[in-house]
């Protein structure tokens, strides 16, 4: 069933019903099939899209650009040093300027209140590419990937665990998404790194309606048992000081996804997910610093898990583009 999401902002999953979320995922699946099949139709021809990036990006930027190009749109990239936003011009004013020039605006940056203000004043669809609190386009890609690898299970039949820093934008967003879609989510983390209590309470209220199960636990074995998917993210988020590493590594090491954790699921077909980039070896500058300082080749996930048959991280990364395309088509397409 089609939904009319035209001219809607896409700022956080809390703003959407389960059926609207499922519609966007289904649309992404259809668009992916069309791209691979060579019969994709352009729904954004003649549209101009602004991409505001106050934080750097690989996957999100590329996904928005390729998705827009595939659909016939033109994009302008405004990078961290490429505009006056927040320096000489407020977001409220920027929104009203860009809204006169562009048909849609993506924002990736800091506080959720910034993208909310952009959405309130732009007068055109605004899409959240990541804020400190939420990362909704990633969740659409994650759930699409779970459907592809879930052996025919619906989202409300899937069990998954998120290990690590559960108070960050990924922990928040996965919990909201799971609550909306009636899923069984286990947030496995030190108690100090659980999501804010008010957000947990909101999600539990949603879960009462959807049948979702939300578990917060510090016990890794209890949290991962019987899951279909294991998910993690970096232990120190974008913008945090390097000084945070020492304490974070000490607290988070028990929550590393390694082969012992894979085996603890008791599911030989369990799949591993990560929004990327991941610290899984010492082949990057940061990875080498970590290896030299802590004697660990890999932090939140080990190399043997990341490169194993359990890992579906690159399918997940590709699906960023298909789901972002679906969001733009649903809210801006003809």
Swiss-Prot record:
Record localization: Cytoplasm
Give me the residues that bind L-ornithine, please.
Answer: 169, 233, 237-238
Q: In the Enzyme Commission scheme, what number(s) does this protein have?
A: 2.1.3.3
Q: In which pathway does it act?
A: Amino-acid biosynthesis; L-arginine biosynthesis; L-arginine from L-ornithine and carbamoyl phosphate: step 1/3
An example Gene Ontology molecular-function term: amino acid binding
Q: Which domain of life is it from?
A: Bacteria
Where is carbamoyl phosphate bound in this sequence? Answer: 57-60, 84, 108, 135-138, 275-276, 320
Q: List the disulfide bonds.
A: none
Which keywords accompany this UniProt record? Amino-acid biosynthesis, Arginine biosynthesis, Cytoplasm, Transferase
**Where is this chain primarily localised?**
cytoplasm
Q: State any GO BP term from the record.
A: arginine biosynthetic process via ornithine
Q: Which reaction does it catalyse?
A: carbamoyl phosphate + L-ornithine = L-citrulline + phosphate + H(+)
> What's any one GO cellular component for it?
cytoplasm
Q: What does this protein do?
A: Reversibly catalyzes the transfer of the carbamoyl group from carbamoyl phosphate (CP) to the N(epsilon) atom of ornithine (ORN) to produce L-citrulline.
Question: Belongs to which family?
Answer: Belongs to the aspartate/ornithine carbamoyltransferase superfamily. OTCase family.
- Indicate what this protein is called per its UniProt record: Ornithine carbamoyltransferase
Gene (name only): argF
């Amino acid at each position: 069933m089609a939904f009319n999401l035209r001219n809607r902002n896409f700022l956080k999953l809390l703003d959407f019903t389960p059926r609207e979320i499922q519609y966007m995922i289904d649309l992404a699946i259809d668009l992916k099939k069309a791209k691979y099949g060579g019969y994709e139709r352009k729904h954004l021809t003649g549209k101009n899209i602004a991409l505001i990036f106050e934080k750097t990006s690989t996957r999100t930027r590329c996904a928005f650009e390729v998705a827009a190009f595939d659909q016939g749109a033109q994009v302008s990239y405004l990078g961290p040093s490429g505009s006056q936003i927040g320096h000489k011009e407020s977001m409220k004013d920027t929104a009203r300027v860009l809204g006169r020039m562009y048909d849609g605006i993506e924002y990736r940056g800091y506080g959720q209140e910034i993208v909310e203000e952009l959405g309130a004043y732009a007068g055109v669809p605004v899409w959240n590419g990541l804020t400190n609190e939420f990362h909704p386009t990633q969740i659409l890609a994650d759930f699409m990937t779970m459907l592809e690898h879930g052996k025919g299970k619906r989202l409300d039949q899937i069990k998954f665990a998120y290990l690590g820093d559960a108070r960050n934008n990924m922990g928040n967003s996965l919990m909201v998404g799971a609550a909306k879609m009636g899923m069984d989510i286990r947030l496995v983390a030190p108690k100090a790194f659980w999501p804010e209590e008010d957000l947990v309470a909101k999600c539990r209220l949603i879960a009462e309606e959807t049948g979702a199960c939300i578990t917060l636990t510090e016990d890794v074995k209890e949290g991962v048992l019987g899951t279909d998917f294991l998910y993690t993210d970096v232990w120190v988020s974008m913008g945090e000081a390097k000084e945070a590493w020492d304490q974070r590594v000490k607290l988070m090491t028990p929550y590393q996804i390694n082969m012992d954790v894979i085996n603890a699921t008791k599911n030989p077909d369990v799949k591993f997910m990560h929004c990327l980039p991941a610290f899984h070896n010492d082949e990057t500058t940061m990875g080498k610093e970590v290896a030299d300082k802590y004697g660990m080749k890999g932090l939140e996930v080990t190399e043997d898990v990341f490169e194993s048959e359990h890992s579906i991280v690159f399918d997940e990364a590709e699906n960023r583009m298909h789901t972002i395309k679906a969001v733009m088509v649903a809210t801006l397409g003809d």
